[in-house]
Amino acid sequence: MAESDRLLGGYDPNAGYSAHAGAQPQRIPVPSLLRALLSEHLDAGYAAVAAERERAAAPRCWQARAVSWMWQALAATLVAAVFAAAVAQARSVAPGVRAAQQLLVASVRSTQAAATTLAQRRSTLSAKVDDVRRIVLADDAEGQRLLARLDVLSLAAASAPVVGPGLTVTVTDPGASPNLSDVSKQRVSGSQQIILDRDLQLVVNSLWESGAEAISIDGVRIGPNVTIRQAGGAILVDNNPTSSPYTILAVGPPHAMQDVFDRSAGLYRLRLLETSYGVGVSVNVGDGLALPAGATRDVKFAKQIGP
């Protein structure tokens, strides 16, 4: 024992340790402040207060959830009731709607039948008037000259039927292919139709320029007041719907007409559509083409000739 140890009362703090263990300093674990900040976010007091708050709020939370579930159930019940009422009303109204539709369809068909009957009667009376007029005017030379002039005017006005040689132009619309990805393949957006009203208008004008004396499209005579226009997916000729294939009859000198029509803008347009879209085009010479008279028009102006 060293002298200094005896002066301290004879106590040796390294007694019982080896020289190496006795010389090793004693380590006292000190908690790391950084580790405490990362692992212990709240003080024990704060944690206790938070836990107490959660225990106090638990009953209120269950009450709020119960109220929310109750409102949701009430809303679902109201929605189901509204849908049930709508279905019941639709079922009760459906028979009446169908009956009204059937009545409207029957009325439209009846009106169409009456209009067709009146149109036929009007055409019959017009033919009788024409026959009587010819009988009366055929007695003298002045009347015959007047009849000849009336025949020329009737041909120009498309008010008399015509039979004679001419050209038959048939145009077939193939419709756009359903698997085309190029938008330019559709001439009208959202429509499968290739032949349009302006194409038929150009063909008719080209036939007039070629020397045609009378023209008809699908049995409808082309006259001064006749229009060719587009109405959705249909082409109306004098308000009569037509469909492919479009048959255009032109009465006149067939060979001279064909020579001019082959170089016309109308046939050029059809050939271009034939190449680009596969439109069917045929031009044939025929004899004995029969064109009906045009629809009878209302007389708006008249002038008396003679006493």
From Swiss-Prot:
Keyword line: Cell membrane, Membrane, Signal, Transmembrane, Transmembrane helix
Topological relation to the membrane, as annotated: Multi-pass membrane protein
Compartments where found: Cell membrane
Protein's name in the database: UPF0749 protein Mb1854
Disulfide bond annotation, renumbered to this chain: none
One GO term describing the cellular component: plasma membrane
Signal peptide: 1-23
Native source species: Mycobacterium bovis (strain ATCC BAA-935 / AF2122/97)
Source organism, top-level taxon: Bacteria
